[in-house]
């Protein structure tokens, strides 16, 4: 199963809009080895059970049934995290709340894609 990198954002957030090009570049670079999802938490608040985010954008990285990372990071740090998820060197550092959110994100993506989430 490919790792999943979900960017949790909000349409009104200027930082999220600026981050979108960086996220697209990650997808172009790592897309064959990792799944990427851009998720507006306000549009998907019901499916995500209204997650309590401290900062935008927030990355959620998971592999299999493990939540590897959950938090806000700079683009440079995000690239290191994505590379670590892809090569298997990223050690899990996210808690139970991130694991629950990862499950909700996967279900949302399955609904969007008709069962195609990683």
Q: Which role fits each region the language model picked out?
A:
Residues 14, 43, 76:
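Short alpha-helical
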Residues 91-118:
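Acidic/histidine-enriched, glycine/proline-rich intrinsically disordered or flexible terminal extensions
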């Amino acid at each position: 199963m490919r790792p999943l990198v979900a960017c949790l954002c909000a349409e009104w957030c200027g930082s999220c809009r600026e981050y979108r090009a960086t996220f697209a570049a990650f997808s172009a670079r790592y897309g064959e080895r990792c799944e990427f999802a851009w998720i507006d938490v306000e549009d998907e608040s019901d499916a995500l059970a209204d997650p309590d985010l401290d900062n935008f954008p927030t990355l959620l990285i998971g592999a299999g049934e493990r939540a590897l990372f959950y938090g806000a990071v700079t683009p440079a740090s995000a690239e290191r995290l994505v590379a670590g998820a892809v090569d298997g060197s990223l050690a899990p550092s996210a808690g139970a709340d991130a694991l629950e959110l990862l499950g909700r994100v996967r279900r949302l993506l399955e609904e969007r894609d008709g069962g195609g989430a990683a």
